[in-house]
Amino acid sequence: MPLRSEVRRWMRKSHDDSWPEHFRWLARFYRWRRRAFLEGVDRAVPADVTAIILVYGRPQNAETLVHLLLRTPSVQRVVLSNNNRLIHIRDWLTIQDPRLVIIDQPVDRSCPYRHEIARRYESPFYLLVDDDLFLAPSQLEWVLGALRKDTSRVHGVQGQLFDPGTDAFLHNIRNRETPVDVVNRLYAFTRVHLREFFRLVDLLRFGPGSREWYQSMWDDMVLSFSGNTRPLVHEVGTFIDCPLSSDPTIAVWRQQGFFDFRVSLFHRLTALKSLSP
């Protein structure tokens, strides 16, 4: 791993955590990563998945994420998009692999742009992973295997349920096999879902050139409606969250108006399309 990545991981803690909490997380992370890097994975699957990672405020996670994805047998290529023009992402990487595609964006990009990247690569299956979430290759394969068995919906490991009684979302639905209304942070989907995503984007008028296209508040919601049935999250065992996933200087969900925007969008999406349970 690049030295600068490990130094930043040690020195950059979440504003919500104390230093002792941060050091305990580091110990858990390194134990988990060692096991994930060494585990054996069944390779009797086709390599037909395009995986995409966006990096903006957490470049120290890039090498670990790329390594985990390249060790996942289903993954044909990994596209790493550096969405922060102030960062030279190659300074944070030592991996050299023909399956790794690195894109340095000329301007800062938002989350919806990853779907534009996906559209450039003809592939039956796609995997989007946020840069604050670590899953082992076997866990990624579990989700991709579920997608292969059921292509009617988007698959993931964490999501949200909408509660009509309170007109709000229940968050952090994870560690169980269950349908959700919105899947978050990791998304396994098909080329058909990608086309439907852009159809819904057009209906919402959220496409390139709109104000919403440059906001990172909504693409997970629209993608969740791109199937015919509700998204499904899976029980895959212990995975690791980066503590900076809740850091107010980075995390989009900490922005003012985030939740109100998403509730309003959920109502618009349910008016446009109903999903089977």
Label for each model-derived stretch:
Residues 118, 134-208:
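Conserved catalytic core of nucleotide-sugar-dependent glycosyltransferases
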Residues 84-121:
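Active-site-proximal specificity loops/subdomain of glycosyltransferases
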Residues 129:
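Catalytic metal- and UDP-sugar-binding loop of GT-A-like glycosyltransferases, i.e.
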Residues 126:
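Short aromatic/hydrophobic "clamp" motif used to bind/position activated sugar donors
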Residues 2-34, 42-46, 60-65, 191, ...:
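C-terminal catalytic/acceptor-binding lobe
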Residues 79-82:
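Short internal beta-strands
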Residues 53-63, 84:
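Active-site beta-to-alpha loop of glycosyltransferases that engages the nucleotide-sugar donor
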Residues 67-76:
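Short, acidic, metal-binding catalytic loop of nucleotide-sugar glycosyltransferases
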